[in-house]
UniProtKB/Swiss-Prot annotation:
Family: Belongs to the phytoreovirus minor outer capsid protein P9 family.
Region Disordered: start-end pairs: 297-320
UniProt-recorded name of the protein: Minor outer capsid protein P9
Cellular compartments per GO CC: host cell cytoplasm; viral outer capsid
Annotated localization: Virion; Host cytoplasm
Annotated function: Minor outer capsid protein.
Pfam family, one: Phyto_Pns9_10
Top-level taxonomy: Viruses, Riboviria, Orthornavirae, Duplornaviricota, Resentoviricetes
InterPro entries reported for this sequence: Phyto_Pns9_10 (IPR008776)
Length: 320
């Protein structure tokens, strides 16, 4: 794709990406992999060099914000070595004259209110923008350069993902300023506009979901037989101050999970301690439903994961 897109064409392409994030659910990267990877591949191709900016704009908009968070968490939790490339740009062409204007028109065209952007503080907003820009460059891979270092890049990029998710989770302690532009439910909302009350519920759910997923990931992978996945899990445990024990339970959980297509159940999490408090998964009779992207793929799934090389990788990320 070369040159700039006319507004009509650009809006149509942007709408597809907005819908992707508005409709995204936890675990879609695995549970609905064929469709999701295909849609992300198209979105990356359409956005080209603007892919990081497009994700950031969707992150700032209340309608698509949570979808972006779920998408990033799914990539972080994935043990497929190629999934991080979904954040990489597909080419060096910037196809939009003014992305923000096109985004605004696209949201309006989808019947979302014009002024629905979250007022995220400058500190975290700048951090997220810089993160996406960096991943746009460093997560992209070329077959011409080879993929001999895919394991090391998986470790580095996944650590970066978990770090930004940690910072996001911490920032959710003070979300009231983020809601400044959103209306109160008592005053009514326009079209599909979200109210302050709705976003408070979304942020509350996000905190619990992230905390539960992190605990599950650490418990499952700290003793993984895969040294690269284990390195990431140990980093995450340190980052989140989660106490772990060195034994074979994590390895056994991982092997058992592969047999059933999931990595662990809440019952395998009993006794995990961390600074996440009430967000720790418990098995005391109150079942916690989890849907993170921590599943193993079916053997017949050989879809692209952001670049052409991914279909060459086996389930544990090695060439197969």
């Amino acid at each position: 794709m070369a040159g700039k897109l006319q507004d009509g064409v650009a809006i149509a392409k942007i709408k597809e990406t907005i819908n992707l994030f508005c409709e995204y659910s936890f675990g879609d990267l695995v549970n609905n992999r064929r469709e999701i990877v295909g849609r992300v591949h198209d979105a990356r191709k359409n956005a080209a060099l603007a892919w990081p900016d497009l994700i950031m704009n969707c992150f700032l908009h209340s309608a698509s914000h949570y979808g972006v968070v779920k998408f990033l968490l799914d990539i972080a939790l994935s043990t497929r070595f190629g999934d991080f490339t979904l954040l990489g740009v597909s080419s060096q062409n910037y196809p939009f004259y003014d992305l923000h204007v096109v985004m605004t028109k696209a949201f309006c065209n989808l019947d979302f209110a014009k002024d629905e952007y979250l007022m995220i503080n400058d500190s975290f907003s700048s951090m997220m923008s810089a993160f996406l820009d960096e991943e746009g460059v460093h997560s992209a891979m070329s077959m011409e350069l080879g993929i001999h270092d895919i394991e090391d890049r998986f470790v580095l990029r996944t650590k970066r993902l978990f770090y930004i998710i940690h910072e996001y989770h911490m920032s959710l302690d003070e979300i009231e300023p983020w809601l400044e532009k959103l209306p109160d439910a008592s005053g009514g909302t326009l079209l599909n506009q979200k109210s302050k009350e709705q976003m408070r519920v979304i942020f509350s759910n996000a905190k619990v979901r992230i905390a539960n997923s992190i605990n599950l990931y650490v418990t499952t992978h700290t003793n993984s037989y895969n040294e690269y996945v284990r390195e990431v899990a140990e980093y995450v445990a340190d980052l989140w101050n989660i106490q772990t024990t060195t034994n074979t339970q994590g390895h056994e959980n991982e092997l058992a999970a592969e047999d059933f297509g999931v990595l662990a159940s809440s019952s395998q999490m009993n006794g995990t301690k961390s600074e996440l408090g009430d967000s720790v998964i418990k098995s005391d009779g109150n079942e916690v439903k989890l849907e993170p992207a921590m599943f193993t793929r079916n053997d017949d799934e050989e879809e692209l994961a952001g670049s052409e090389f991914t279909s060459l990788l086996s389930d544990d990320g090695r060439m197969g």
